[in-house]
Structures are given as structure tokens and as C-alpha cells.
Amino acid sequence: FKPAPENPILSQRHLPAERPFKVDWAGHADLVEGPDGQYYGVFLAIRPNEENRVNTGRETFILPVDWSGTFPVFKGGLEPIQPKLAMPQGVKNETGKNGYFPNGNFTFTETFTGSSLDYRWVGVRGAREGFISTTAEGLTITPYETNIKAVLPTSTLFYRQQHLNFTATTTLKYVPRTEKDLAGITCYQSEKFNYVFGVTKKAEDSYIVLQRTEKGESSTIASEKIEGNTPISLRVTAEGDKYTFSYSVKDNNYQTVGGTVSGDILSTNVAGGFTGAMIGLYATTSNDAEAL
């Protein structure tokens, strides 16, 4: 390869760190010819939050490329990249259709009553169908004995975090039999970096617990005694780096558990790697999130 004399042709490193709607770490581009005969560069970049942490991982961007000379040059490759870019002429926008992921602001509701799962739901280290079944009443999870920190298949059903700001809610019908039983939700970067927010048991009572795991070491942030034998709604809300976990047993009156916590352990800056965090449904019979 012969380096281009105009290098770099795609970079954000020279731009002010505090610029609004920042897109950063641009690179790893593929050059393609579009249906309009114009060249484009499809590349990876990230959208950091207000703490400059990356919880959504690498994402795909596109810019037009001028290849009229000897070397390709990205049009706008040294300018602040915008989170939303124009579609190439002749390309049909099928965002959110026919197996393509949705983009931008949207809501997604899953009842789990269909015969098959939406393609957006993913498992870890094993087929998702190994521990779930869909019924007329919703999803049933038959929990594995493995804990979420195990490097083994776990009974977790995930949806990738796509937004810096989001709310995810689920309603749970569950009665733990022992302190080793837990079911709820998780925000997950890896087996070593995650939050678990779920229902478990202490003595004869049911509790909602919030557990934080960093570098494989877990601690219970907070817990609250709750009514047993009652459906419970669990919710996680993120505003950039700030995450809150809450629950409701009636009338959508949500109570926060553990206050506002940092999403630092869900970022690639802290946990490593390049993929974003996931929000998931989780159940286990090897729980170690103890009620306080």
C-alpha cells in the first residue's frame, strides 16, 4: 500500500473534545460504489455520553467519497460527523423493516405471545430457545443453574442498547422458592461487568435487589422487601451515564432502588472491548445477589 499524501482522510481526533452531538473514533472503512455511481465509505464510529464513555459500542456510519483523483478522499471526513447522515440516492430506506434494525427514536413493545421471537432478541453462548417458551400469557423462562457471571450459557434474553437515553420495562410473575432463585432484568456488558435487578428470597420474604458486578466482583447496592405472589413491573432508565432501576407493584407507582448509579461498568472504556451494552431478561437458580 502507498500512503496518500493527504492523510488523514477520515479522522475526528483534531476536533474540540466538547463539541455537541459528538461522533468519535471514526475508522475501519470499506469503500463501496453506490447505485448512483458515487463512491461511499462505510465505517465504524461511536457516540459517547456526557462522561465521554461508550455504552452503545461501535456503530455504522457512511460518508460520500471523492475518488476522481489517484487517492480516495472522504467528503467531510475531517469535519464533525453528524449522528444522522443523508441516504445515497437510489437506496431504499428499510430501517426497522425486513430484518433491518430500527434507527433514531422509536418504541418497541414485545408481548412474547407469537410463535417465534423477534430477531432483535439475542442469547449468550447458546441458543435462546434452550431456556424460553412463548405462551398466550407471555414469555416463560426455565432458568439454568448458571449465574450471569459464568462463562457458560446463561438464561438471559438480551436486547442491544441503541440509545444514550432509554427506558426499558417488563412485568414479571415470579415467586422465588429459595435464596438461590432470582428473576428480573440486567444491564450487561459482559460476565464481569453488569447490573442485576431482580426478585429473590430472604428467609420467608421476597425482596427486590440491585447488584453491581465490576471486574467479576459483585456487591448489593440496595434491596427492598416486597409483596409476594403479586405481579411486579421492573424498569431501567438511562440518561447518558446515569442509570436508575425501579419497580412497581400497582398503579405504575415506581419506586427507585439504590438511587442513581453510574453506567461506567457498561461502557467499553471500563469493561473493554468494542461492542455495546445489552438490556436483558434474566433468571437463575444460582443467585448470589443477597438482600441486605
Say what each PLM segment does.
Residues 1-292:
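Carbohydrate-active catalytic/glycan-binding domains of CAZyme proteins
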